[in-house]
Amino acid sequence: MAKFSKMQVMAAMKETGMVPVFFNKDVEICKNVIKACYEGGVRVFEFTNRGDFAHEIFGELVKWADKACPEMILGAGTVVDAGTASLYLQLGANFIVGPNFNPEIAPVCNRRLVPYSPGCGSVTEINNAQAAGCDVTKVVPAGNVGGPSFVKNVMAPLRWSNIMVTGAVEPTEENLTPWIKAGVLCVGMGSKLFPKETVAAGDWAAITAKCQEALGYIAKARA
């Protein structure tokens, strides 16, 4: 069961403006990354379903985070079917994210009032997802779809939209500012926030610092 309500999840996404995206088969590495992000000010974290036994790792992380990072909102990403969504919801996912829009996932999440953020690449897909009850839609791959200008042009006719972008998003002021100015609710970041060499070296302090910097750039762009 989800620990946080849909309202709390969306409020945290809006307040911080950033959702780190990560997967590693080593649960201890995952814990260290999540803790580093938490200490850097992150409050929403997407664990991606991208490896064998990923759901088992996620279940362990949810139990651990409840005490180690009590305000961290953990969700599951790379979910493409209703069965997998149900599995992660049972393990405590507070939100579900997918690279595509699957209308079969929406009612599974809606029944439990858990946010479902599907990947969309057009105004039609975004609006169809909204009609299915998706409060936050994800534009992916954001860089290929059209960048900040695409988001800005979507927000013109669909002013009520809450858009998350992933792909071509980097933790730099030059990159983040255009996305925020375009009107996104939040940005998702993976490899740019967690370089392989940083994770391999166990330099968790560097991840904390990078999160702090990115959140600072987002706040500045919103000011």
Feature map (PLM): residue ranges:
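Glycine/Thr-rich beta-alpha phosphate-binding loop at enzyme active sites
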Residues: 43-52, 84, 89-91, 112, ...
